[in-house]
A protein has these predicted regions:
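Bacterial N-terminal signal peptides that target proteins for export
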Residues: 1-9
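Aromatic-enriched hydrophobic runs in primary sequence
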Residues: 4-5, 15, 27-29
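Bacterial N-terminal signal peptides
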Residues: 9-17
């Protein structure tokens, strides 16, 4: 009797493994893309889901508003935004913005360089041109309050041509005004 139980157990185990092996080789009706799909791994492109709308100055001309899809990279905060000209699935990626805590930028970026290339998000948000979209009002306010503690730098690299031209400029926030040394150093009380 015990030999029979062992034989049945071995048969069940063998059948199980044979079934598993055959199912991996089975083509069935699954599309080829699904058959070869590896487990989904996290990628740098994931997480750009904070949606912000704001116009920018590009070469001195107000343009946009642009759709920013942003992601927090580090809690300082450090934020990156991919910026598109619309919300359409095939929208053009026209800008990238890097956003850093003022305690980082103000301690490392010389004032003259900051006035040329950076902008203060507290001033931009207070100007009323920035909208945090797709979130309830209380969550949108949390995002705006966090971003108000930062400075941003925007690279604009799409000028509406059919193909890239290699032209690039640093865009600015609408309403940006150069700061004095005292204003720049006194960012915490602003």
């Amino acid at each position: 009797m015990s030999h029979r139980i062992v034989a049945i157990c071995l048969l069940v185990v063998f059948t199980f493994f044979a079934g598993v092996a055959m199912s991996h080789g089975h083509k069935g009706t699954q599309p080829a893309a699904q058959e070869s799909a590896a487990p989904v791994k996290a990628s740098p492109a994931e997480g750009y889901n904070v949606h912000v709308l704001a116009p920018h100055l590009v070469d001195g001309k107000q343009m946009g508003p642009y759709h920013h899809y942003c992601k927090v990279i580090a809690p300082d905060p450090q934020i990156q935004c991919l910026i598109y000209d619309s919300t359409e699935p095939n929208a053009n990626l026209v800008q990238v913005e890097w956003i850093y805590a003022k305690k980082l930028t103000r301690s490392q970026v010389p004032l003259q360089e900051w006035n040329k290339d950076w902008h203060d998000h507290k001033i931009e948000i207070a100007g009323g041109r920035v909208q945090v979209l797709d979130l309830p009002p209380d969550k949108a306010k949390e995002v705006a309050d966090l971003v108000a503690t930062t400075d941003g730098m925007i690279y604009h690299f799409y000028f509406g041509s059919t193909l890239p031209t290699g032209k690039m400029s640093v865009a600015q926030a609408v309403g940006h005004k150069p700061m004095t040394s005292a204003e720049y150093k006194n960012y915490e009380s602003k």
